Regions:
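OB-fold/S1-family single-stranded nucleic acid-binding modules
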Residues: 54-69
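Short, intrinsically disordered terminal segments enriched in charged and Pro/Gly residues
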Residues: 103-128
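Structural detector for short beta-strands of small beta-barrel domains
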Residues: 2-14
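Short nucleic-acid-contacting surface segments enriched for D/E, G, S/T with interspersed K/R
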Residues: 37-50
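Short aromatic-glycine-enriched beta-strand elements
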Residues: 15-21
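Residues immediately within or flanking Cys/His clusters that coordinate Zn2+
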Residues: 70-71, 87
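Cys/His-rich microdomains that often coordinate metals
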Residues: 80-81, 94-97
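Short cysteine-rich clusters marking metal-coordination/redox-active sites
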Residues: 73-76, 90-93
Length: 128
């Protein structure tokens, strides 16, 4: 998922099957229950999720591939199981999701290099 974002479910109406997810950027995006990736068609308010944003009906932005209990790697963008900023390891690039390094991009911590350097190095590997 290249445009993966993180957020939390702000509201969900089981009867109608519609909900809102608040993205990390502060915007609220609507979604339909068929976009919940575990197939349950229901989700609790407050659940941390990853999702992608696509143009939906009538040109409105909609959340798709709403995935509960996951986090988006700040280095490579891949979606991983687990909680965000809980020192989980990315299965794609090996980044340890350190909350301090997420806030202070040039700091080292759980990872030997900073988030800024890791992103630069990851982009360089893709360019080859």
């Amino acid at each position: 998922m290249t445009n993966a974002q993180e957020g939390r479910v702000a509201s969900f109406d089981d009867f109608v099957g519609l909900g809102l997810v608040d993205g990390a950027d502060g915007q609220s995006i609507g979604f339909h229950c068929t976009q919940i990736s575990d197939g349950s068609r229901t989700i609790a308010v407050g659940t941390p999720v990853t999702f992608a944003v696509v143009a939906g009906h009538l040109g409105r932005w909609e959340a798709t591939r709403v995935r509960p209990g996951s986090w988006c790697c700040p280095v490579c963008g891949s979606v991983n199981d687990g909680r965000p900023r809980a020192y989980e390891i990315c299965t794609t690039c090996g980044w340890e999701d350190d909350p301090v390094q997420f806030e202070y991009l040039d700091a080292t911590g759980a990872n030997r290099e900073s988030l800024t350097a890791a992103r630069r190095d990851w982009a360089a590997t893709l360019a080859v």
